[in-house]
Amino acid sequence: YTFAENLYEVYCIKNSACYFLIPSILLGIRRWRIMMVSSKGRYALRVMIYLAQNDREELIPLKEIAENQNISMKYLEMIVSLLHKGNMLISGRGKKGGYRLARKPSEYTIGSILKLTEKTLAPVNCLEGGKVTCEKAGYCITLPMWQKLDGIIDDYLETVTLEDLLEGRV
């Protein structure tokens, strides 16, 4: 995937991690920086996309989602619980129980989904939680660069919606 005239690329390794590769033009250096999205974040996106693709009034059983997405029931239960608590899914119990999106696909940004599932999207630890936590921040020469990169990542992920992914607009 590319954004803003090839300013970054995303690579996914099968059954492993996805990496955002940020080139030197953004970092002011001559190498790539890697930001990893966990399997929990990637699976949450897959679940949300599956539910958006199968948008219907009735609830979709967890077993159907697990089988279709090849995610273990135990791991999937944890992910949908997180998405439900974050008001992204509507759930129901019983024979006709399951899950569906709480809103239209156009109303979910990828950033909002990943922020719910990931501990942080910050490219460095000192920016976790949206504030600078490093004791060296007062004299850190690289801090402005990391803050700018954090803003670029956040801005981009907040512009891409589930609908954009479904329509191939990324």
Predicted regions and their residues:
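Beta-hairpin "wing" of winged helix-turn-helix
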Residues: 88-101
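Alpha-helical residues within the helix-turn-helix
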Residues: 67, 84-85
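N-terminal helix-turn-helix DNA-binding core of bacterial DNA-binding proteins
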Residues: 37-39, 43-45, 49-71
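Short, Lys/Arg-enriched N-terminal segments with co-localized hydrophobic residues
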Residues: 2, 9-14, 18-35
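Key DNA-contact positions within bacterial/archaeal DNA-binding proteins
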Residues: 74
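Non-DNA-binding regulatory cores of transcription-related proteins
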Residues: 102-170
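Short, hydrophobic-biased segments on the C-terminal half of alpha helices
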Residues: 80-81
